[in-house]
UniProtKB/Swiss-Prot annotation:
Annotated transmembrane regions: none
Residues spanning the signal sequence: none
GO cellular component: cytosol; endocytic vesicle; endosome; membrane
UniProt keyword annotation of Membrane present: yes
Species for this entry: Bos taurus
Superkingdom, taxonomy of origin: Eukaryota
Stated name of the protein: GTPase-activating protein and VPS9 domain-containing protein 1
Amino acid sequence: MVKLDIHTLAHHLKQERLYVNSEKQLIQRLNADVLKTAEKLYRTAWIAKQQRINLDRLIITSAEASPAECCQHAKILEDTQFVDGYKQLGFQETAYGEFLSRLRENPRLIASSLVAGEKLNQENTQSVIYTVFTSLYGNCIMQEDESYLLQVLRYLIEFELKESDNPRRLLRRGTCAFSILFKLFSEGLFSAKLFLTATLHEPIMQLLVEDEDHLETDPNKLIERFSPAQQEKLFGEKGSDRFRQKVQEMVDSNEAKLVALVNKFIGYLKQNTYCFPHSLRWIVSQMYKTLSCVDRLEVGEVRAMCTDLLLACFICPAVVNPEQYGIISDAPINEVARFNLMQVGRLLQQLAMTGSEEGDPRTKSSLGKFDKSCVAAFLDVVIGGRAVETPPMSSVNLLEGLSRTVVYITYSQLITLVNFMKSVMSGDQLREDRMALDNLLANLPQAKPGKSSSLEMTPYSTPQLSPAATPANKKNRLPIATRSRSRTNVLMDLHMDHEGSAQETIQEVQPEEVLVISLGTGPQLTPGMMSENEVLNMQLSDGGQGDVPVDENKLHGPSNRSNSVSSLDLEGESVSELGAGPSGSNGVEALQLLEHEQATTQDNLDDKLRKFEIRDMMGLTDDRDISETVSETWSTDVLGSDFDPNIDEDRLQEIAGAAAENMLGSLLCLPGSGSVLLDPCTGSTISETTSEAWSVEVLPSDSEAPDLKQEERLQELESCSGLGSTSDDTDVREVSSRPSTPGLSVVSGISATSEDIPNKIEDLRSECSSDFGGKDSVTSPDMDEVTHGAHQLTSPPSQSESLLAMFDPLSSHEGGASAVVRPKVHYARPSHPPPDPPILEGAVGGNEARLPTFGSHILTPAEMEAFKQRHSYPERLVRSRSSDVVSSVRRPMSDPSWNRRPGNEERELPPAAAIGATSLVAAPHSSSSSPSKDSSRGETEERKDSDDEKSDRNRPWWRKRFVSAMPKDDPSPRLSAQAQVAEDILDKYRNAIKRTSPSEGALANYESAEVMGDGESAHDSPRDETLQNISADDLPDSASQAAHPQDSAFSYRDAKKKLRLALCSADSVAFPVLTHSTRNGLPDHTDPEDNEIVCFLKVQIAEAINLQDKNLMAQLQETMRCVCRFDNRTCRKLLASIAEDYRKRAPYIAYLTRCRQGLQTTQAHLERLLQRVLRDKEVANRYFTTVCVRLLLESKEKKIREFIQDFQKLTAADDKTAQVEDFLQFLYGAMAQDVIWQNASEEQLQDAQLAIERSVMNRIFKLAFYPNQDGDILRDQVLHEHIQRLSKVVTANHRALQIPEVYLKEAPWPSAQSEIRTISAYKTPRDKVQCILRMCSTIMNLLSLANEDSVPGADDFVPVLVFVLIKANPPCLLSTVQYISSFYASCLSGEESYWWMQFTAAVEFIKTIDDRK
């Protein structure tokens, strides 16, 4: 058989440790980045929405807000301050947070309150509507908020529109709650912006290119647009037939152009129906469904209302003002274009209403030229959707797991909202919702909350929006619920609240502070920071038992968490990863379930974390605000579910159930099973079969009492928390294994295990596991680590301390006592008896079947123990597991007898077997202490023939368990070692049972008994032999003082733990290969050769001495001391157990990888969301500037008219250029002195100057562009026709162009052609040059794409430019060149100058090409 190579094992373990450390550091950084990005996103979103509301006020220019006030307010908004709510509200913040949270989750109450407020004519109803959108629902950044708001809209349809006498008039007026909320929602919905951009960008740009004339179709209005002189010139003498004929011809021409234009819009509308926002479609279909049931409303009337909602409230506003929606960014829309856009919007609405009696009879002729059903068909598609009750949710929610935990709301908004609700309450308009509102208001303080003097109530009635969403685990499937009570979460809300500041008055120098009020919900779990043991235990629990309570899982997560923020673990993730091996779907499902749970749990967790000041331990202090706000810790951790057992728990259980089988299956085929690492047991490469064994072992860990309640566990944990200081591995393990205990996990220092050793051990695990192919080396290494981790949990202070503690056998042993509660976990892990452990739970019933893959060798006790511990993590599983868990685990194994094994196992076993079972039970406890002991104990047991031992073993395991906690000296020394271990463990369990529940202890006993029995049958003699070999003197001092059996188990676990640390820190050095005969993959214990491990450690000690590394020397020497007491066979079992554990840790590596990927995806999505919000903000600010410029120019209209008259009189180009420049400078000066611009920033002033230039040049465009009028027009027409002829004969490979063949693949460069075709839409010379630059850069990009080996030069570029110009044939080329040369030539420089030179050269070359040749 192949021998296990200690050097290979050390190499893999070191790789694992390095990899895990690296991954955890990266995950820590990613978590911090996600929190910061989320905080920035919500703050920016809050400010952006306030700016948009401020813009609406400016456009309306209502009496309450002058343009100057709006401008000052816009400046103040940029400096919005977000402060924690308690600074303003004091202790009352909690009450207000609860009020806002419950109100937010009751869409029906919100809708009925808004309707009641309108009926009562409340002045601040509109302000409250803004607050609902911006604060309560955080601008709908989170999908959860969007879903709530959609329900509010649905209830408004039912309570407001359905009850109205004339709902259509109410809707058209646009002042009802539904209209305002719909407008806010549709404006902010990103999918709506995508639809509008895809649908309207191209047709609007085409309209701007052709905006020569007003497309007026009313003859009377058409005539009025011309002066008498122009009328006579165009139409002849007024009143004559020729005049009327010419006018009609122009009307017909305009109608034809308008029909073509509208048809283009309709075509794009139909083409892009597929990307119509699902949420808007849902609202429209709900309206149609609800109002169709009203008897007094005809179907046509209902359809007309849906048309109004779609077109009048959504599409047409974007058609008329595309700049406001970001559809058109740099192309100015002049008066002619605006008029034509309004004509298009009007026709679209009329076409949608065809079939109804309405319509202007004068437009009937125009409408007759359209397809009657063109727009109606689009409407049918939107309305035709199935009216499902629940709002649509995105199939891919990249922010899944993230949840909002705070509300951003200003003080004035908060008071207004509360007063509004109170007035509604007293108004008697609420009907059935009155009780719900009464309950909400009952918890609010009667007196107004105190607020700092700095916050004065602002007269502004503008609603302020405050984001209340905090990303918990965005998008990552990491179930990271970011809901936490922490102030950080509040930050998210702050973002939304910025709108509130908009309400400030112009007199305010400082903006009203936005309060960040915690909703009091949300887990505080951090993705990727679960300890190795938690992940493995979760996997085991999920795989082994479907009915594990969700709560326990959640608890496990927290325990992990408290220890280290650095390790961001998602419990959900871990679960998914565990299953990820062969059956990843299970893992994913579990993960999703976990995510769902997490949200609910956050609150409880957060409370607990605060209670134990775990936040500081986690290192969250620095970025506390951010983390809390974002509460990025995502509900990933199962922990969350503990707190909300309802939905999440169900989901988790479903996942666990489904995953239980899938997981086990996947466990059986762990990823990496194909890795080269040899299976220590069989000597063959570790294969998926091994995973089977480990999966079985996992069950044992579940053996913890299934009945144990969380509260009891928490108590246990607290009682054991004292252990934290103890370095007992057993204690640590127990703690870690018990993570399911909520209290325990938090108190002991959640991921202490993973954190302390984890850093080293987990790292190596992950590294090794990937190589070994064992995802879960749950066995001893993990177990050790678990214990270690648990221990660390208890004492999170420093890794080194915990590591040292691990090395201190005495402390470990002693700690074990205090950790009594945790022993349960140990039982699950009695992996140290190699043969027995595998059997543990599964062994008894179907061990043989399963284990066969391992060969005769069953998992080493250490392995078993490790498995158990891992499983124990799923203690939640364990609780029900006494029979259930086992059965579920077994089921995957396909061993029907598994369920009943536990009870009968012990009875069925022969006396020796019974003893084995007992020892096994003890072993779990001691497994952490010393795997070797366990194995030795097993051998000894097998050999034992004494009646006392047999009787002791035969004794029912439950009775053994209840044996006094104090170890009893057995007359027989052999028995004493093993029996004592069992006794000790049982005693601990008894204590735990007393504290928790008898059933729990019983379960643990049964599991251990079962394991022992099975294992014993598998390896009777070896076990007994080992026990005999180990004398009381060999045991650690602490062990010798106690019972020998317990000592041997502890020694084995302890040695395995220490050996793993030694191996993972060893460097490969020259070392002679020792020859050992192996049997069934295990070293033959009869070999007399020197111990391979001891030789290896001696070399490492020599190196440590050489390097003068005192800490390493101490660790290695202690390891050597522990290992020396074992014989060769036990030592090889030790190595095999470590290797098996390594293989089984693969799920932890997968967990870390998945967490990292999830965090990276979340971060990328958050950055994209931030990009969108910043773009929205930029669009709103630029449009705001445009509106202010329009107001300025209106005040200077007289001066502008004088300028135009003077400009017409000039003939020389230089004079014209000078006059334009002088007038622009005059306007710039006037702007600087205008009160509106007093608070403008430098950027705003630059935008304003650009807007002024565009407006002025628009007014004189024709005069400047065609200085010679008809002469210039005819000249352009000649060149246009010439290019048109060339276009028919010139191809990309035409010899006159000489385009290099390598660049012909991208011909005809359509994107560059589309760029230059829009040049007519730009009216200023600067914008036209920019259009040319975009075309040139597009060509260069395409050329670079075609030939990546070289940079295209001018010789490559110019021929392509010529070809693009010929094919695009933009209008007025010559006039464009002349216009730019006259008014912008002096401003050209650098890149602009170069590309302009290339462009003019291309135009000149085109003029010389003879199309006849």
